Regions:
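Extracellular/luminal domains of secretory-pathway glycoproteins
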Residues: 2-560
Length: 560
C-alpha cells in the first residue's frame, strides 16, 4: 500500500508542475442585485437603475419657456377680467400655468361658468394671449358702467354690465366680424336678479330676452329671477358663457335686458404644454426637460416614478420603486482558496476579483510566475450588446401616452372616476410591460455571460488540442513548457499547436507511463490481497470444523 501512495503522490506532482492556463470572469465587491424571470436578488458585478426617482421641488422653465404663475388670481378670473387680477400678463408667453391653491380672485360676482373645464383647457393650451376690443362703449345706447361691491366697487375688465339709462332700456343690437385672421375667445353673461324690484330697477321689465349668435352657435337666454343664498354679500347671480369666433365669422348680440356684454376678447397664440399646476411650489432659477406638480427633473433614464402627470420631455411613468438592468456578470466570489501553494483555478471555482480590465480573461502559471490578463474582444462585444439592450428597452417603451390631470365638473364625477381608472390601468400595463421586459433582458444577459465564458473556454480548448489536458476547474494543464510569450499566443488566438506537438507527445507518454505502472502495481496488489483473503477465510473454516468434530458437535459419517 505504501508503494501505491508513493506512486500517486509522484503522479500528482508531475501534473501539478505543468504550466497552466485558466479561463475566468470578473468578480467584484459589488452589492448590486437584479431580478430575472426565474430568480430574485441575483448578485451582479454591475447594474443600471432605469428608474428616475428624484426631483428638485421647484417650478422651473422648460424647453417652451417660463411658467405663468397666477399668484392670487385663477384662470377664469384672468379670462373674464377680475379687476384684482394683473393685466400686465397680456402678451406674456408661458410654457405652463400655475394656480395657487389659495388664489381668491376668480369670479368676483357669484355664478357659474358654462363648460369651465373646457375653457381652462383651451386657454392653458395656448402660449400667450392678446386682448382685443370687440364692442366699444359707443356701441350701446344704455348705461354700460354697472359695478358691484363684490368686485371691489368695479366690474370685470373684459365685459360691460348694461343697465337702463334715463329710465329706459331699448333693444340693443350689435354685431362684430372677426377680421383678425385668428380665433378670438369672447365672453358674456346673463344676470339673474334676486327680486322683481331689482330686475325692474336695472332693466325696466321682468320679461327680457337675449340672443347670442354666430355661424356656429345660436343661444337664447331669459333671466331666472329669485333669491339665492348669500355669496360675497349678494343674492343675485351671473351665468357666465364663452365661445370662439373664427376668422371671417360674425358675432351678433340682441338684448332688451340682463346682458353682461362682451367688451374685450382674447386672441390666443402658440401652443404650450397645456398644463395647469395647482401648487404652492416656489419658482426656481432652473430649466428642466420635465416638470411635475412635485418639482422638475432632468434625466436620461427611460422611466420615472415621480409623477404620472409629468409633462415636457419626460420619461415614462411607472409606479414602482426600482427597475434595475443587469449590465455586468453574475457576481460569484471564489468558492474556495486557490489550493496548495496558491495554485490557480478557473471559472468553475468562481470569479476573479483581480480581473479589473475586462469581464472575461485568462490566468496562467509557468516558470516565470503567475499572470492575469483580460480578454478585451469578448468583453467589448458583451458591452456593445448591453448598450444595445438599454436602447432596445427605450425604443420598446417609447410609445407616448401622456396622462393629463383632467378637470371635471361636479356633475361629471362618475366620468372622472372612470377616467382615473382607465389611466391607472394603462399605467399598470406600462409598469408590467417594463418590468417583464427588464426581467427578460436580465435573464438573457446573465445567460449570455455564461455562454461567453464557455465560448472562450472552448476557443482555447480547440487551439490547444492534445497539447493540454482539462483539469475540470476551467483550466488547461499544458504538456509542454509555455513561457509568457507562449501564453500570450494562446490568449490572442495565434497559438502554434504544431510547434509544441512533439514535446507534448513525449510528456503525455511519460505521464501515461507512470499511470500504467501505477495501474499494473495496483492490479498485482489486488490479486495478492484477494488470494490472501481467501486463504484466511479457508483456514478459519477448517479450524471451525476441527473444533466442532472434537467436541462432538459435528459428526462426519462416510458411507460406502
Amino acid at each position: 500500500m505504501e508503494t501505491v501512495s508513493l506512486i500517486t503522490i509522484l503522479l500528482v506532482a508531475t501534473v501539478s508542475n505543468a504550466d497552466k492556463i485558466c479561463i475566468g470572469y470578473q468578480s467584484t465587491n459589488s452589492t448590486e442585485t437584479v431580478d430575472t424571470l426565474t430568480e430574485n436578488n441575483v448578485p451582479v458585478t454591475h447594474a443600471k437603475e432605469l428608474l428616475h426617482t428624484e426631483h428638485n421641488g421647484m417650478l422651473c422653465a422648460t424647453g417652451l419657456g417660463q411658467p405663468l404663475i397666477l399668484d392670487t388670481c385663477t384662470i377664469e378670473g384672468l379670462i373674464y377680467g377680475n379687476p384684482s387680477c394683473d393685466l400686465s400678463m397680456e402678451g406674456r408667453e408661458w410654457s405652463y400655468i400655475v394656480e395657487r391653491p389659495s388664489a381668491v380672485n376668480g369670479l368676483c360676482y357669484p355664478g357659474n361658468v358654462e363648460n369651465l373645464e373646457e375653457l381652462r383647457s383651451l386657454f392653458s393650451s395656448a402660449r400667450s394671449y392678446q386682448r382685443i376690443q370687440i364692442f366699444p362703449d359707443t356701441t350701446w345706447n344704455v348705461s354700460y358702467d354697472g359695478t358691484s361691491t363684490a368686485c371691489s366697487g368695479s366690474f370685470y375688465r373684459n365685459m360691460r354690465w348694461l343697465t337702463r339709462k334715463n329710465g329706459e332700456y331699448p333693444i340693443q343690437d350689435a354685431q362684430y366680424t372677426n377680421n383678425q385672421g385668428k380665433n378670438i375667445l369672447f365672453m358674456w353673461g346673463i344676470n339673474h336678479p334676486p327680486t322683481d324690484t331689482t330686475q325692474r330697477n336695472l332693466y325696466t321689465r321682468t320679461d327680457t330676452t337675449t340672443s347670442v349668435a354666430t355661424e356656429e352657435i345660436n343661444r337664447v337666454f331669459k333671466p331666472l329671477i329669485g333669491p339665492r343664498p348669500l355669496v360675497n354679500g349678494l343674492m343675485g347671480r351671473i351665468d357666465y358663457y364663452w365661445s370662439v369666433l373664427k376668422p371671417g365669422q360674425t358675432l351678433r348680440i340682441k338684448s332688451d335686458g340682463n346682458l353682461i356684454a362682451p367688451w374685450y376678447g382674447h386672441i390666443l397664440s402658440g401652443e404650450s404644454h397645456g398644463r395647469i399646476l395647482k401648487t404652492d411650489l416656489k419658482k426656481g432659477s432652473c430649466t428642466v426637460q420635465c416638470q411635475t406638480e412635485k418639482g422638475g427633473l432632468n434625466t436620461t433614464l427611460p422611466f420615472q416614478n415621480v409623477s404620472k402627470y409629468a409633462f415636457g420631455n419626460c420619461s415614462k411613468y411607472i409606479g414602482i420603486k426600482s427597475l434595475k438592468l443587469a449590465v455586468g456578470l453574475r457576481n460569484v466570489p471564489s468558492r474556495s482558496s486557490r489550493g496548495l501553494f496558491g495554485a490557480i483555478a478557473g471559472f468553475i471555482e468562481g470569479g476573479w476579483s483581480g480581473l479589473v480590465a475586462g469581464w472575461y480573461g485568462f490566468q496562467h502559471s509557468n516558470d516565470q510566475g503567475v499572470g492575469m490578463a483580460a480578454d478585451r474582444d469578448s468583453t467589448q462585444r458583451a458591452i456593445d450588446k448591453i448598450t444595445s439592450k438599454v436602447n432596445n428597452i427605450v425604443d420598446k417603451m417609447n410609445k407616448q401616452y401622456e396622462i393629463i390631470d383632467h378637470e371635471f365638473s361636479e356633475v361629471e364625477t362618475r366620468l372622472n372616476m372612470i377616467n382615473n381608472k382607465i389611466d391607472d390601468q394603462i399605467q399598470d400595463i406600462w409598469a408590467y410591460n417594463a418590468e417583464l421586459l427588464v426581467l427578460l433582458e436580465n435573464q438573457k444577459t446573465l445567460d449570455e455571460h455564461d455562454a461567453n465564458v464557455n465560448n472562450l473556454y472552448n476557443k482555447v480548448k480547440r487551439a490547444l488540442g492534445s497539447n493540454a489536458v482539462e483539469d475540470g476547474k476551467g483550466c488547461f494543464e499544458l504538456y509542454h513548457k509555455c513561457d509568457d510569450q507562449c501564453m500570450e499566443t494562446i490568449r490572442n488566438g495565434t497559438y502554434n499547436r504544431r510547434k509544441y506537438q512533439e514535446e507534448s507527445k513525449l510528456e503525455r507518454q511519460k505521464i501515461e507511463g507512470v499511470k500504467l505502472e501505477s495501474e499494473g502495481t495496483y492490479k498485482i496488489l489486488t490479486i495478492y490481497s484477494t488470494v490472501a483473503s481467501s486463504l484466511v477465510i479457508a483456514m478459519g473454516f477448517a479450524a471451525f470444523l476441527f473444533w466442532a468434530m472434537s467436541n462432538g458437535s459435528c459428526r462426519c459419517n462416510i458411507c460406502i
